[in-house]
Regions:
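Terminal presequence/propeptide segments associated with secretion/organelle targeting
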Residues: 2, 16-720
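Sec-dependent N-terminal signal peptides
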Residues: 4-13
Length: 720
């Protein structure tokens, strides 16, 4: 009786998932979620959402570029995603003469669609629970360190072996991905098909796609048209292929119908996408560690980098275009780190985590299992032991690896060894390879003088953050040869290195010298940074292995407790395809303040500030607003919708995700979360967490009325 009472108590406490909480595995929907989704308003069968044996909505959702989500919206391979997901490719095609970032881009014919070098979109063909098979392979394997259960190389071999057994064919375009879930208590195999000829079709100007920019980022209310459009191309027989002028638009097996009827408070929605990372199974000590290391370093270091980049980008158009994507990428998680730390304190997440820990420990005691308590104590001890190493590693990563671009100078070891070996054939091959690597380093988006200015600030900041006796070994040179003056060291790098300019590299390669390579300051700096980062990893290796084992046991405990209580479960995000659901809704961020669930074009006009580049409104958009020329995209009361908020459980990687209504029709595109919900990566809060979405009516309004690209709408299935 005592055991039953305890389980009943645990079921009522805060580990219970809220109706809106969860990044659910598609394979679990029918068993775990279908009834709840239908109670909340889902108006189609769960098999229309996902079914392994039939074509369904899953088949119209793509992993876009490996870091975002996209959705197929026409039978000829049109893919809709966010403007910020396509931003790097818009920037790739931009120049001072063709400034697509500022002016936007619209292909009025198929011939005008622009190939995007390096862009892939990936469909998920099959999702297989291979837990039992992997566990059998683990038992057979020789694993003296006991780490194969998380080893990517080992799991890749297991995936290949399983595919051979099941006769799953793979090639350059159809690949396997086997990943651990729930701390490696379960394993799933994903069979994926990637298309590598993807072309840019349309993007609004940044004054629409990035309206509000950094000021509004991670905020609600929002007023940006954060979308861009691409097209998948394939060979003439419909197979994935590398870029070729002979390729044709892909005839897809599934595309999503678009609904223009709009949204209202309380409407059921669901989202499919590829959420990147979250950490819902952390204990409180890990949350504190995250606040004091990763988030602290992002806030401190990126803030300095962004200030310098902003100053340089304001000076001329060329620099602005060169650094637009880098700036946006850095700023995104700079603000995220600030908001997360503020929210973790404001919402008392540490207290909540401590209560949840006590529930699980009590559950373990109630069933006579002390493994969960041992795992908890082990994690606490490990987090304390590794604190300084994590702190230092994050400083190296943020300041020196991400912050200083000259860290990425090409590897010169092959040439140095060839020179020492004195074999001309080896030397010629190494010279040719370094020449090619140099071309990639000196790409059109690299500005050495900007890098010099940023590097001076960040290397000095690293020195202030890390005690002298712990710094990476290049600081011995800085102390000895530059009297500790980091600015002088950076100047010497940019004045003397063979990588100071393309011309300097070419001149060196005419008569390469091993000693000069060995003494080159940029080369030595890059090696020191790499070695310093690796040293922090090596210093934590024992703790990392012990942590992984303890975390696996801890998560197993959570699963067992939820199973005992009949509660649904979901794993942490790991860039695999998931589904989340919730209702459209307003919310109250603070006493006396309410944010409505929607925004309109009126709000864009109210925010306009011609003196602030983040809030410039295009003249054509103002003209359409003043004339109320909204076409069929207006709300019933005549206003033009822009964005809406829904209580789905999103995180980074969900950017570009399709937002479906109860009938599985597209009503919007997810692009962000609200500031009050940034703690959601660690702890979900149903009252405050919202996903910001571009209303599909605004997307089509911009395509049709603003851009005049109505030919694209003719490809789409639109329900009016």
């Amino acid at each position: 009786m005592k055991h039953k009472l305890l389980l009943s108590l645990f079921a009522t406490l805060s580990l219970t998932a809220h109706a809106d909480e969860g990044m659910w595995m598609l394979t679990d929907l029918k068993q775990q979620n279908a009834a709840v989704m239908q109670d909340l308003g889902l108006d189609i069968s769960i098999d229309q959402v996902y079914c392994p044996d039939n074509i369904n909505l899953k088949d119209a959702v793509v992993h876009f570029g490996g870091g975002c989500t996209g959705e197929v919206i026409s039978s000829e391979g049109l893919v809709l995603t966010n403007h910020h997901c396509g931003y790097g490719y818009i920037q790739q095609h931009s120049s001072v003469e063709h400034d697509y970032l500022t002016d936007g881009f619209w292909a009025m014919t198929r011939e005008q669609e622009l190939p995007c070098k390096g862009l892939n979109v990936t469909f998920i063909d099959r999702i297989l629970d291979v837990t039992e098979y992997v566990q059998k392979q683990l038992k057979k394997s020789k694993d003296p360190d006991g780490t194969n259960y998380l080893s990517p190389s080992f799991l890749a071999k297991v995936a290949e072996k399983f595919a051979k057994k099941e006769r799953i064919r793979t090639n350059e375009f159809t690949t396997l991905e086997l990943k651990p879930f729930y701390g490696a208590n379960k394993y799933y195999l994903f069979v994926k098909t990637s298309y590598k000829d993807v072309r840019m079709v349309g993007a609004p100007p940044s004054s629409i796609g990035k309206f509000g920019a950094d000021t509004d980022n991670w905020m609600w209310p929002r007023h940006c048209g954060d979308f861009s459009i691409f097209r998948i191309y394939a060979s003439k027989d419909g197979k994935p292929a590398n870029y070729s002028a002979e390729n044709v638009p892909l005839k897809v097996k599934k595309h999503i119908a678009i609904n223009l009827k709009g949204v209202k408070e309380g409407d059921f929605t669901f989202v499919m996408g590829f959420p990147g990372r979250n950490w819902r199974y952390m204990i409180s000590d890990e949350v504190e560690e995250r606040m004091q290391t990763t988030n602290f370093m992002r806030d401190t270091i990126r803030g300095v980098r962004l200030r310098v980049l902003g100053e340089e980008m304001a000076k001329d158009a060329r620099t602005r275009i060169q650094y637009a994507a880098k700036y946006a990428s850095s700023a995104n998680y700079w603000k995220n780190a600030i908001g997360m730390n503020e929210g973790l304190v404001r919402l008392k997440v540490l207290d909540r985590k401590k209560r949840e820990q006590e529930q699980l420990l009590a559950f373990g005691d109630s069933i006579g299992n002390d493994n969960y308590r041992k795992a908890y104590e082990s994690i606490k001890q490990i987090v304390a032991q590794r604190h300084d190493a994590v702190y230092h590693q994050q400083a190296i990563y943020e300041a020196l690896m991400l912050g200083t671009e000259f860290f990425k100078v090409p590897d010169t070891d092959a040439l140095r060894m060839a020179l020492e070996g004195q074999k001309q054939k080896d030397i010629d091959e190494a010279v040719a390879a370094l020449k090619e690597a140099g071309k990639k380093f000196f790409n059109k988006d690299y500005n050495p003088e900007v890098d010099r200015k940023v590097s001076k600030q960040l290397i000095a900041l690293y020195a202030r953050l890390i005690p002298a006796d712990q710094r990476i070994d290049i600081f011995q040179t800085i102390e000895k040869d530059f009297q500790g003056n980091t600015d002088a060291f950076v100047d010497a790098c940019f004045n003397q290195s063979i990588f100071r300019s393309p011309e300097a590299l070419d001149e060196f390669l005419k008569q390469p010298d091993a000693q000069q390579l060995e003494n080159d300051l940029m080369v030595r700096y890059a090696a020191s940074v790499r070695n310093g980062y690796q040293a922090t990893s090596d210093a934590m290796q024992e703790e990392t292995n012990a942590y992984n084992a303890a975390h696996k046991t801890w998560v197993e405990g959570v699963l067992q407790m939820k199973k005992a209580n009949g509660q649904p479960i979901y794993p942490d995000a790991n860039s695999t395809l998931r589904l989340t659901y919730g209702k459209i809704g307003s919310y109250e961020p603070a006493d006396g303040k309410e944010y409505l669930y929607y925004t309109t074009l009126k709000g864009v006009m109210e925010k306009e500030d011609p003196n602030n580049p983040e809030f410039v409104v295009p003249a054509k958009l103002k003209e359409l607003y003043e004339k109320k020329d909204f076409g069929p995209y207006a709300m019933p009361d005549g206003r033009m919708p822009v964005c809406f908020a829904t209580a789905t459980d999103n995180t980074g990687g969900n950017s570009g995700s399709p937002v479906f209504n109860a009938k599985g029709e597209l009503i919007g595109t997810g692009f962000d979360r609200n500031y009050e919900g940034l703690t959601g990566d660690i702890a979900y809060n149903p009252q405050l967490q919202r996903a910001a979405c571009v209303d599909i009516r605004y997307t089509l309004f911009i395509i049709d009325k603003f851009a005049g690209a109505s030919h694209l709408l003719k490809e789409m299935t639109i329900i009016r």
